[in-house]
């Protein structure tokens, strides 16, 4: 099992975030628990966003190294 936040896989974080969203959407969560879950979800969301941004930068570098044309650019962000 992962011991550090950095060791947790993207897919595991995404699944955890989906579970939090389902729990909050159910409405069966006490207010204090809902706030805690929301805060946890926001932290996971930031981690996922950072991971995606790093992956995007890596792909841009790889494509750039291979001197291949691409319609993709780091400026074209749809989020």
From Swiss-Prot:
Q: Where in the cell is it found?
A: Cytoplasm
Which SUPFAM superfamilies does the record cross-reference, listed alphabetically? XseB-like (SSF116842)
Highest taxon above the source species: Bacteria
The EC number(s) this enzyme carries: 3.1.11.6
| Listed GO CC annotations | cytosol; exodeoxyribonuclease VII complex
User: Principal localization?
Assistant: cytoplasm
> Which controlled-vocabulary keywords does the entry list?
Cytoplasm, Exonuclease, Hydrolase, Nuclease
| InterPro entries named in the record | Exonuc_VII_S (IPR003761), Exonuc_VII_ssu_sf (IPR037004)
GO process terms (BP):
DNA catabolic process
Instruction: Write down the chemical reaction(s) this protein catalyses.
Output: Exonucleolytic cleavage in either 5'- to 3'- or 3'- to 5'-direction to yield nucleoside 5'-phosphates
Q: Can you name one GO molecular function term for this protein?
A: exodeoxyribonuclease VII activity
Q: What class of enzyme is it?
A: hydrolase
Q: Which family does it belong to?
A: Belongs to the XseB family.
Free-text function comment from the UniProt entry = Bidirectionally degrades single-stranded DNA into large acid-insoluble oligonucleotides, which are then degraded further into small acid-soluble oligonucleotides.
Q: How does it assemble?
A: Heterooligomer composed of large and small subunits.
What is this protein's name?
Exodeoxyribonuclease 7 small subunit
Organism in which the protein naturally occurs: Lactococcus lactis subsp. lactis (strain IL1403)
